[in-house]
């Protein structure tokens, strides 16, 4: 697996995160150092490697300030498998809900997809060539061979009445005639020139055996997956366009061209050495009243999570995986509880603490304009597809930021997510009318913003429901 991104210096990682995330420099620095330490560990001898584990991170801050986005972008920068889970979805072993080991199995699934996608990209040209050959044969088929019933050694005992069920000649063809060869040559040329992309062709695709009803509980999920793998995959015929058929066939051939066992082993190692698990809402399982029944259950979840953070061997459908060197990032607002309300053993497993700042008006302005594909740029691009040009003035952007900040103060503080609701509401009429106003130019000014939002933003009751 190509993990060139892990060789980035902390400054380079922070620089890449700055392309997408505004502010929160302390959090960016700490995750960048954690990533760099992984690279440093990879350069050590085997004995030293085993002694050094990642320093897990606890992010503390209100919703919408960038906790998840920092972790997600960080994983993307280095090509590491990443999953986000919510601590509240887990329950103690023996209760209804997801068991904590499922987060590791989910991470391995992500890792397998990453590794196989990269390996498939290396054989893509060969797989596409095979797919094109198959398409030519499908578009200009030869005569099918008749099923052979003459070579069964038992037929002489039964007067030739026993057909040979052991052979399936369904897909075998007679040798192509000269006429068919000529037609195929012409079709191949047209395929290469892209002239047949919209033509329809019938192909056989594997049908997912589906879930087994009797194994629907989470505890039996792995058993269900194993059963699905053992069950024969039924093939069904579909009529699709040539361009779609090529993708389906190429993907199937790419699967055949890569070594599945080797890919699975590589994925397990990648998950072990580079995996990142983001545990959100960890504050919701913190306990500040140790007498209530609910808090006893929350403590149980914490104690179930603890062995995975300390290092456990988890069985997955691809093999066993050790969690000792995975990086865990816990996150929560900690409005009601405090990090010290977590059980002491779990607190000790998150040695790096970082507090994320609440967002100011200036932060909102930067979020609207600075990232690589900021919200303003996204809406401009979407409306441009309808040939409607939208221009936001600097004053209008500042006004939007002020309204978002004020609504957060007056109602629930949902951080940068408030900008999505504000922009959607402000541009609702324009988005609806855009198809009927081609070549229009719309200037978004402070007056435009106030006309669309002021009556709502100044009414706290309306803000709570609409924005």
From Swiss-Prot:
User: Which Pfam families did the record assign?
Assistant: AAA, AAA_2, ClpB_D2-small
Cellular compartments annotated: Cytoplasm
Region Disordered, residue ranges: 149-192
Q: Which UniProt keywords apply?
A: ATP-binding, Chaperone, Cytoplasm, Nucleotide-binding, Stress response
List the biased-composition ranges (Basic and acidic residues).
Answer: 178-192
Q: InterPro entries, per this entry?
A: AAA+_ATPase, ATP-dep_Clp_protease_ClpX, ATPase_AAA_core, Clp_ATPase_C, HslU, P-loop_NTPase
Q: Where, in this chain's numbering, is ATP bound?
A: 22, 64-69, 280, 345, 417
Membrane-spanning segments: none
Q: Which residues form the signal peptide?
A: none
Question: What are the record's GO terms for cellular component?
Answer: HslUV protease complex
> Per its record, what are the GO molecular function terms?
ATP binding; ATP hydrolysis activity; peptidase activity; proteasome-activating activity
Q: Its Gene Ontology biological processes? A: protein unfolding; proteolysis involved in protein catabolic process
| Assembly information from the UniProt record | A double ring-shaped homohexamer of HslV is capped on each side by a ring-shaped HslU homohexamer. The assembly of the HslU/HslV complex is dependent on binding of ATP.
PANTHER family this protein is in?
A: ATP-DEPENDENT CLP PROTEASE ATP-BINDING SUBUNIT CLPX-LIKE, MITOCHONDRIAL-RELATED, ATP-DEPENDENT PROTEASE ATPASE SUBUNIT HSLU
According to its UniProt record, which protein family does this protein belong to? Belongs to the ClpX chaperone family. HslU subfamily.
Reported function: ATPase subunit of a proteasome-like degradation complex; this subunit has chaperone activity. The binding of ATP and its subsequent hydrolysis by HslU are essential for unfolding of protein substrates subsequently hydrolyzed by HslV. HslU recognizes the N-terminal part of its protein substrates and unfolds these before they are guided to HslV for hydrolysis.
**Protein name in UniProt:** ATP-dependent protease ATPase subunit HslU
**Species lineage:** Bacteria, Bacillati, Bacillota, Bacilli, Bacillales
């Amino acid at each position: 697996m190509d993990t060139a991104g892990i060789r980035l210096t902390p400054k380079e990682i922070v620089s890449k995160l700055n392309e997408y995330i505004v502010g929160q420099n302390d959090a960016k620095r700490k995750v960048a150092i954690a990533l760099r330490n992984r690279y440093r560990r990879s350069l050590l001898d085997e004995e030293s490697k085993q002694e050094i584990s990642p320093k897990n991170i606890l992010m503390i801050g209100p919703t919408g300030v960038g906790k998840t986005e920092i972790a997600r972008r960080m994983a993307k920068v280095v090509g590491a498998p990443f999953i986000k889970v919510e601590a509240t979805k887990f329950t103690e072993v023996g209760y209804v809900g997801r068991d904590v080991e499922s987060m590791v199995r989910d991470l391995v699934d992500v890792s397998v997809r990453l590794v196989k996608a990269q390996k498939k990209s290396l054989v893509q040209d060969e797989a596409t060539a095979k797919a094109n050959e198959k398409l030519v044969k499908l578009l200009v088929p030869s005569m099918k061979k008749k099923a052979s019933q003459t070579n069964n050694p038992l037929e002489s005992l039964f007067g030739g009445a026993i057909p040979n069920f052991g052979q399936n000649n369904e897909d075998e063809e007679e040798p192509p005639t000269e006429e068919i060869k000529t037609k195929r040559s012409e079709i191949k040329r047209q395929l290469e020139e892209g002239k047949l992309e919209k033509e329809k062709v019938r192909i056989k695709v594997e049908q997912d055996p589906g879930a087994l009803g009797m194994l629907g509980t989470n505890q039996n999920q792995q058993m269900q997956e194993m059963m699905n793998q053992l069950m024969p995959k039924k093939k069904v015929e579909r009529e699709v366009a040539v361009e779609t058929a090529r993708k389906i066939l190429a993907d199937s051939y790419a699967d055949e061209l890569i070594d599945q066992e080797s890919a699975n082993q590589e994925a397990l190692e990648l998950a072990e050495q580079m995996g990142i698990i983001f545990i959100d809402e960890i504050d919701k399982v913190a306990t500040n009243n140790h007498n209530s029944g609910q808090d006893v259950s929350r403590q149980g979840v914490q104690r179930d999570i603890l062995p995975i953070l300390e290092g456990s061997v988890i069985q997955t459908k691809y093999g066993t995986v050790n969690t000792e060197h995975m990086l865990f990032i816990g996150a929560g607002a900690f409005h009601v509880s405090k990090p010290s309300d977590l059980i002491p053993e779990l607190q000790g497993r998150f040695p790096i603490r970082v507090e994320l700042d609440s967002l100011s008006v200036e932060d909102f302005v930067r979020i609207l304009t600075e990232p690589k594909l900021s919200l303003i740029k996204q809406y401009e691009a979407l409306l441009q597809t309808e040939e409607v040009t939208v221009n936001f003035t600097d004053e209008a952007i500042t006004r939007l930021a002020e309204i978002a900040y004020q609504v957060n103060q007056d109602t629930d503080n949902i951080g940068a997510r408030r900008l999505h609701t504000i922009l959607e509401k402000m541009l609702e009429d324009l988005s609806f009318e855009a198809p009927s106003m081609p070549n229009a130019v719309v200037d978004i000014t402070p007056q435009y913003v106030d006309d669309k939002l002021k009556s709502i933003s100044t009414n706290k009751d309306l803000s709570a429901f609409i924005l």
